[in-house]
């Protein structure tokens, strides 16, 4: 059976097989199939899809701050549509086990001027139920005094659908079709 995972990757599965994204085909029943995603069984008819969706609430200053997972490690983060990449500091990189100085050295322009950062690829970024693999990120030298929260920038956000209504933001993306 062919399935589209994360809205873009076509995978061919037989019952019992698992995709690199963690989707398992349990069984096929004529015009429907049962999948296992994140430990949950989901029955879908042919042509039906499932969407990963996360609802965020703005803090009193209007910022969308949330706990997210980067390479499986939970860190506090803020949605930042003005940031080109997911942005981390050296302390975050250490917690993730990333030797960021092996990344590509880049100059970034920020509200506080130019800074030197290192471009790396994160294996996974997950905000609530919405998860992506291989997301570009930049890591600044320095610690939480310069960049206290991880910035969830456009390298993640451009791959999801983002809707804002008042003080709520919904992030979503097709998970399985």
Summary of predicted features, one role per range:
Residues 1-177:
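Pepsin/retropepsin-fold aspartyl endopeptidases
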């Amino acid at each position: 059976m062919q399935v589209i995972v994360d809205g873009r990757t076509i995978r061919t599965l037989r019952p019992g097989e698992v995709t690199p994204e963690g989707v398992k085909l349990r069984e096929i029943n004529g015009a429907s199939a049962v999948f296992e995603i994140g430990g949950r069984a989901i029955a879908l008819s042919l042509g039906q899809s499932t969407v990963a969706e996360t609802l965020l609430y703005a803090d009193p200053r209007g910022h969308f701050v949330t706990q997210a997972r980067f390479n499986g490690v939970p860190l506090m983060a803020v949605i930042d549509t003005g940031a080109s990449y997911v942005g981390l500091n050296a302390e975050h990189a250490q917690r993730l086990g990333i030797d960021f100085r092996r990344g590509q050295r880049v100059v970034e322009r920020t509200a506080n001027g130019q800074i030197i950062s290192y471009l790396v690829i994160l294996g996974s970024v997950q905000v609530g139920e919405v998860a992506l693999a291989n997301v570009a990120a930049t890591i600044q030298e320095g610690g939480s005094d310069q960049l206290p929260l991880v910035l969830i920038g456009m390298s993640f956000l451009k791959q999801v659908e983002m809707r804002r209504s008042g003080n709520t933001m919904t992030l979503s993306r097709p998970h399985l079709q």
